[in-house]
Structures are given as structure tokens and as C-alpha cells.
Amino acid sequence: MPYIIKYHKTLKEDLNELDEFSRSRIRKAIEARLLIDPLKYGQLLKGTLKGFRILRIGGYRVVYKIVKKEIIILGVRHRKDIYEIIASRGEINKR
């Protein structure tokens, strides 16, 4: 059974801050890596973001969580501020 991707309600804001090249690159990485094997490509996070994973794409980070066969993407930001932004978002909204 393949994975299904769901997005946090604020992900659109993250993507709107990126240029078209970066958005395309991130979209391709999600399709090529996360849909195929999110456990292999994502690194587990620790501390306040324990239970989440991160996918590195150049200077950007995709923070996600795996729940059964769903990949819930919480945010996409530059590596310098991703952790602070994600921690401030709190619980995942699966919609």
C-alpha cells in the first residue's frame, strides 16, 4: 500500500515564500523520496520535535511525520528558521 501525503494548513504560506525553482525542487524531492521510502530518506528529530522527521533539500528542510500510511508534512522552510517555526505551529492539522 503506497503512502498518502497530507499537508498542514500553513504549508501554502511556506511555499509562497519560495521562488519557483525551489518549489519545484522540493516538490520533486517529496515525490521521489518521501512517497517511495519516507523512513529511509528522512532523519528523525529529537527534543521538542521528537517523533518528526526531516528531509534535507539543499538549504531547505521539509518537516514531516508518518502516521500509518500517511505522510503529514508540517512545514517547508530554510534551515536557519525551520525548527523555530515548526515548534510554534503546535499540533498537526491533518487537513
What are these language model-derived features?
Residues 40-81:
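Basic/aromatic recognition patch in beta-strand/loop cores that engages polyanionic ligands
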Residues 2-5, 13, 24, 65-95:
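Enriched for short, Lys/Arg-rich terminal
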Residues 19, 32-34, 38, 63-65, ...:
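Aromatic-residue detector
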Residues 7-41:
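N-terminal first-folded block
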Residues 5-7, 55:
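Hydrophobic coiled-coil of the DHp/HisKA dimerization-phosphotransfer domain
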